[in-house]
């Protein structure tokens, strides 16, 4: 991961092979912030595991088996009651046939 600061904003590049949640949680610890808005993210992902809450309130995890284009990423970072960084992220992907 590489990052730079411009005023109060951080710009982050996540390196190939780094996991998005873990990398952003590590950034929160490195920089020392308690809360942040994630306003935008794009790029190419592979070996993607994502999850969602179904209509019965059950959290379902699924894999995207092929590399995909991350066309939108947003969310937030906050601290849990025990002080650990927690990420809540929403994403949209596109396959190589432009299906989102």
Language-model regions: role of each:
Residues 1-100:
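N-terminal intrinsically disordered, cationic/polar leader segments
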């Amino acid at each position: 991961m590489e990052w730079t600061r411009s005023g109060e904003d951080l710009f982050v590049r996540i390196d190939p092979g780094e996991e998005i949640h873990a990398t952003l949680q590590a950034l929160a610890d490195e920089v020392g912030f308690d809360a942040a808005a994630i306003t935008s993210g794009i790029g190419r992902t592979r070996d993607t595991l994502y999850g969602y809450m179904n209509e019965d309130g059950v959290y379902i995890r699924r894999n995207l088996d092929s590399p995909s284009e991350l066309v939108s990423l947003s969310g937030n970072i906050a601290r849990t009651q025990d002080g650990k960084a927690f990420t809540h992220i929403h994403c949209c992907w596109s396959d190589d046939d432009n299906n989102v």
